[in-house]
Amino acid sequence: MSELKGACIIGQSGGPTSVINASAYGVIRTALDSGCITNVYGAEHGIKGVLEDRLFDMSQEDPKELELLKYTPSSALGSCRYKMKDPDEDDTDYKRILEVFKKHDVRYFFYNGGNDSMDTCNKISKYMQKVGYECRVMGVPKTIDNDLYGTDHCPGYASAAKYIATSLMEVYQDAHVYDTGMICIVEIMGRHAGWLTAAAALATKYGAGPDLIYLPETDFDMDTFLADVYKETGSCMVAVSEGIHYADGSFVSEAKTSATDGFGHAQLGGLAALLASIVKEKTGAKVRGIELSLLQRCGAHLASETDIEEAVMAGRAAVENAVAGITDKMVAFERETVDGHYVCKTKLLPLTEVANFEKKIPIEWINDSHNGVKQEFIDYVLPLIQGEPKLPKEDSLPRFAKLKKVLAK
């Protein structure tokens, strides 16, 4: 395929992670070094920034600050949860995107996000093809939920898993201080897939983690849960996914309001407090509910070096493949074992195979009682959390990237 000259846009979407900026760095640095990419723009707040023509000129940034993106949590360019309509029903947004693309001669579009973001990528790519505008569109994976279909794992997951396991090991120490015993229930993110909550098993592997783990891959039964807790003696720690549900599909923690996000997902929360109140009422024991909430997705101080390196690799691969003539793909990971050691390589998946699909924990990795995970899961996740990054510090506090965010004219 002939060389395509033009500008590129990198956008970030959905929930932040501790390494999404590392992927952005991979895209930005590789694009700046590319001979056929004329300008590199960062979209303010994802696709909304494109629609509003608010694009940052990334060539104006200090290279040292760009380098710090690898160690900066959250979404440095700004994120959004904006659901684009089907272009066959309403193409207003798509016409506007085309207008902005033409204004800045954008020929490469990279979107860094999860399931919904890949759907956005797919829709934009198909529309550009329909109207005959040549633009190569690539998805860069991101989600702590680890539920993107077709990839071994997702950037962001390993660091969150490491944070969860470490935090629960620390909570375990606190929960076992008193001789009176305590039941501690920890709520962890995960709507339909329990990859994050299952990571708590890493703490248990080293003797300081939850006794019971409940995932959304199986139905939750309150009576069985209470019976499981009763069986534990002394102090008991429980890890639960926010998305655990009853047999009828209703979420245990679903908010009593009708609030949803931009993609129609129900707002969940308060599960730990709910279960804690029920257990306290039934047992009379001392019970504490803990919700890790946003901390699990922005804990860059506990990031996995492996995760950071792979996040950069994903961004770099997206640009290299697009420049080589590839479009309509998402960068994905596949693992290999070389001389007994874990190795991660990139592959490409069609956006149509990824958009709006979810990958869940294999049921055979969950124990027969549905309150824990097996060794297969430990073997899967342990290589991903390895390595301690040398985090930049200033007065013993983290030194994060400070971007100038100069708007393109």
Where are these regions (language model features)?
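Glycine-rich oxoanion-binding loops at beta->alpha junctions
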Residues: 1-2, 52-107, 116-117, 155-156, ...
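N-terminal phosphate-binding or glycine-rich loops at protein starts, especially the Walker A/P-loop
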Residues: 2-54
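C-terminal non-catalytic interaction/assembly regions of soluble proteins
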Residues: 254-409
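Gly-rich Lys/Arg/Thr-decorated short loops/hinges at beta-loop-alpha junctions or inter-strand turns
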Residues: 4-10, 69-83, 142-152, 179-182, ...
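Short glycine/serine/threonine-rich phosphate/pyrophosphate-binding segments
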Residues: 17-27, 50-51, 93-95, 115-123, ...
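Accessory alpha-helical/coil subdomains and C-terminal extensions
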Residues: 100, 108-113, 119-134, 138, ...
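Short, ordered loop/turn segments at secondary-structure junctions
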Residues: 13-15, 43-48, 81-82, 114-115, ...
